[in-house]
A protein has these predicted regions:
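Rossmann-fold dinucleotide-binding core
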Residues: 63, 86-160
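NAD(P)+-binding Rossmann beta1-loop-alpha1 motif at the extreme N-terminus of oxidoreductases
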Residues: 1-50
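The conserved SAM/SAH-binding core of class I Rossmann-like methyltransferase domains
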Residues: 6, 29, 56-57, 105
Length: 246
């Protein structure tokens, strides 16, 4: 299988490397990175030309421009999968902008750690095809709907809880430190949710604060679209923005 990977940051480069290790022919494109172990194209059109599957793993802010940039270079049978954390509306816009089958894919794990084995949700016209291609390569794919945006929406709703929980832990422990009881409060929280989860919430928030600001803003916008006031999502975005500036 020939796979083009657009975006070779932490997530994209790890997935590209895993695909190459699994026997796929991988061509990558990133204007700022050229990792070893895969073929690096000179431009995005060269990366996608002739590919069976295109994986867009750049960023929600550039996903639509990236799709439009390569649209005319795609083969009729190419499957275009967008793996960025984005709003359901953006996923629908991507599907409309592309002349090929589209899959909305939402990754719900820590990609730099688990790579191709990261749990994925998929929706859209190309979801079943995506699952059929990537499950044999080790990716656990759960097809959740036929509409682009269904997978993205589920991830964002999950993120309201997970990132909201992380924000609550960060705020609680910051206050506990100011009060001189950080160790006690840390132990109390860990006794409820487990030390492993607590450490993952704290370390992940610090390491990925900037990216998660965009995620929580997208979640807040989605809640508003659903008629729900995004109190927790908005507060989590604000806290993460402060954290990203430190």
């Amino acid at each position: 299988m020939e796979v083009a990977v657009l975006g070779l940051g932490e997530a994209g480069s790890r997935i590209a490397a895993d695909l190459a290790a699994a026997g796929c022919t991988v061509r990558g494109w990133d204007p700022a990175r050229r990792p070893t172990g895969i073929a690096n194209a000179d431009d995005p059109q060269s990366a996608v030309r002739g590919a069976d599957v295109v994986l867009s793993i750049n960023a929600a802010a550039v996903a639509l421009d990236a799709a439009r940039e390569v649209a005319t270079a795609l083969e009729n049978e190419t499957l275009y999968a967008d793996l960025n954390t984005a709003s359901p509306q953006l996923k629908r816009e991507l599907a409309d902008a592309l002349p090929v089958e589209f899959a909305d894919v939402a990754l719900t794990g820590v990609v730099p750690s688990t790579g191709l084995a990261t749990q994925a949700l998929a929706s859209g016209a190309g979801a079943e095809r995506f699952a059929g291609l990537f499950r044999p390569l080790g990716m656990p794919v759960d097809v959740v709907g036929t509409r682009p945006g269904d997978a993205a929406g589920l991830k964002l709703l999950r993120s309201v809880f997970m990132k909201g929980l992380a924000a609550a832990a960060l705020e609680s422990l910051a206050a506990a430190k100011a009060a001189g009881v950080e160790d006690r409060v840390h132990a109390d929280i860990a006794s409820v949710i487990g030390e492993e989860l607590l450490e993952r919430l704290l370390s992940g928030s610090h390491a990925h604060a900037a990216r998660r600001v965009d995620e929580m803003r997208a979640a807040a916008a989605y809640l508003e679209e659903l008629g729900i006031e995004p109190r927790v999502a908005a507060a989590a975005a604000e806290l993460l923005e402060e954290l990203s500036a430190t």
